Amino acid sequence: MAETAAGLCRFKANYAVERKIEPFYKGGKAQLDQTGHYLFCVCGTKVNILDVASGALLRSLEQEDQEDITSFDLSPDDEVLVTASRALLLAQWAWREGTVTRLWKAIHTAPVASMAFDATSTLLATGGCDGAVRVWDIVQHYGTHHFRGSPGVVHLVAFHPDPTRLLLFSSAVDTSIRVWSLQDRSCLAVLTAHYSAVTSLSFSEGGHTMLSSGRDKICIVWDLQSYQTTRTVPVFESVEASVLLPEQPAPALGVKSSGLHFLTAGDQGILRVWEAASGQCVYTQPQMPGLRQELTHCTLARAADLLLTVTADHNLLLYEAHSLQLQKQFAGYSEEVLDVRFLGPSDSHIVVASNSPCLKVFELQTLACQILHGHTDIVLALDVFRKGWLFASCAKDQSIRIWKMNKAGQVACVAQGSGHTHSVGTICCSRLKESFLVTGSQDCTVKLWPLPEALLAKSTAADSGPVLLQAQTTRRCHDKDINSLAVSPNDKLLATGSQDRTAKLWALPQCQLLGVFTGHRRGLWNVQFSPTDQVLATASADGTIKLWALQDFSCLKTFEGHDASVLKVAFVSRGSQLLSSGSDGLLKLWTIKSNECVRTLDAHEDKVWGLHCSQLDDHAITGGSDSRIILWKDVTEAEQAEEQAKREEQVIKQQELDNLLHEKRYLRALGLAISLDRPHTVLTVIQAIRRDPEACEKLEATVLRLRRDQKEALLRFCVTWNTNSRHCHEAQAVLGVLLRHEAPEELLAYDGVRGSLEALLPYTERHFQRLSRTLQAATFLDFLWHNMKLSPCPAAAPPAL
């Protein structure tokens, strides 16, 4: 039966990349435009621009020097973006078009650490690691001011919101805030009240008050008339950013009066709202479950009423400013992707485990992201139940969790369990129905966890919290770490793969040992049951994949081809093929019957830890240490259909070409023969044209009416013809037409013309020398002919007398 099913299925021949989820933010500054439609963030050498509504990457801006971006800022009118690189160059961008309008040297002696525009969008201030502050007029294109006096890195600069006051504020590593007068070109005041680095400066709407925050766990309110402190508010956390809120009531945030209120973000990982007058905290954001994530950045887009925060693991969160309701989540950088799975009954989502305690769920169509909190240490593995609504995760925190996605795509934790004494490195769900799951740990044990009926009927919106799971069976299975588990399609068998170089087969639910698979030279990374045959596949660090018979535990086949460890293996094409991923970043497609590698796919740059195939077997998803998540599509049928269409088109064109040659319509025949890539037919057409008494004129007219790509192909054909003395005359005739009628600049613009000319020269010289010798010989024969004279016949002797 399995053989019949495998015979009816079509073998896959190729996969193509359909979509990539790549890092777009690796730390540093992130900024919203005033409308809240676009998000700007730094990623290495680029500034990426995202559409906030869809999450799509619209454009990447990269300077010509291809050095890391150290700072950037968007003007208040949203028209100009300026970036600074490690090469000490400033670039002014028309960011909507993606073009650089001006590039100039920063004049700083060290990289630019901070920059800010004034309210008029005409002045730009840059703070350097050399302790200097410079001001630039980006309209007139010149430097206006150069302020010195700050010790060390100037990591913070800000203009006063009132452009008529011409004041610039800066802060360096000495924890003080300097006030610079652009009018007097001097330092007006040095504000010293912080005892650690100042992290942010924000101004009231009238510009009479400034709020500063620091890592000394205080926020200070300053009077900008007297440059004195009016209030020092202890906030009991290291503050990375603070924002002055609009002076209007916001009941959802505990703001009941129109006095001065501000919001802080820091190492506690939550947003808090403070009343400046009393120094009291009036609102505290609810703490997310799981490990606390430090907030590293916070900024307010007043016109859009949006608040942007950034977490330490590079997640960007957008809130509604007046209520702090979460609107959008973006995963800027997933670091090392450890596992990835399709999610949902129609595989509409994927769930990703990266080098983080948080899980990320992406909707594939829109790439909308949902970040799941719960684990307190790095999540190591995932698995999904058959229907696609429930999935399980395990982590280094020695716990497991079960998550449920509702029909709206929202995911919540519905169950959790603990009992292992070391990190839980692998997890596997039951296959027939949602009845149990199995976990394997570094404590060398396997646990079987039955799912209670209450869990399956439980709504994710319930307030009673996650159901607690209890292990039914615990068994010590190996002597070293258990790296992989697999449950058979009938839920009766369990396979385990370990670092001890063996795989074992167990009977469920009591975990009774049935047999051991031995033969690999190094540890096993993955085990998988065939969906149709009684076969087990194992992937090992020795670079091989082995197929084993479940009846007698013998090795049936060994697949060799990976140059490094094989990390994952999956059955595709109804069990007739294998798809594997390795630590060299390669994916390989194998046909089991022939034992051959059909295709090698190269799109990752590092280890591919995650590999999962969709329920319809037409897509695959991979995730690797390069932080890339790639969606692959089976393009076998599409390529075969395309190849069939090409063959049919070739037959039609060939018939048309034969008809044209029969009718002696050489111009169309020449163009068609070139498009069919038939050098011999093209040669035949040119020979037929040259047999005509008016060959030169007809050949010129025919060649000159060809398209440029056809002329390029004809020139390549000439290179081949020119190597043969029998066909060199046609090649030279075509070359002569091109040289006489095409300008040198046009010829040099041809694709591959330099290589063609280099190949033509030696044979052309050889043909020229041969013809010269022939001409010389012919001339010599002619000379001999004209100089040959016959001796006169002797006269008859007179008769004798």
Swiss-Prot record:
PTM sites of type Phosphoserine: S257
Cross-link (Glycyl lysine isopeptide (Lys-Gly) (interchain with G-Cter in SUMO2)): K407
SMART domains hit by this protein: WD40
Biological process terms in GO annotation: ribosomal small subunit biogenesis; rRNA processing
Key words, A-Z: Acetylation, Isopeptide bond, Nucleus, Phosphoprotein, Repeat, Ubl conjugation, WD repeat
Signal peptide per UniProt: none
Sequence positions bearing N-acetylalanine: A2
UniProt main location, coarse: nucleus
Glycoprotein in keyword set: no
CDD domains xrefs: WD40
Cellular compartments annotated: Nucleus, Nucleolus
GO CC list: nucleolus; nucleoplasm; small-subunit processome
Assembly mode: Part of the small subunit (SSU) processome, composed of more than 70 proteins and the RNA chaperone small nucleolar RNA (snoRNA) U3.
PANTHER family referenced in this protein's UniProt entry, alphabetically: TRANSDUCIN BETA-LIKE 3, TRANSDUCIN BETA-LIKE PROTEIN 3
This protein's name: Transducin beta-like protein 3
Species for this entry: Mus musculus
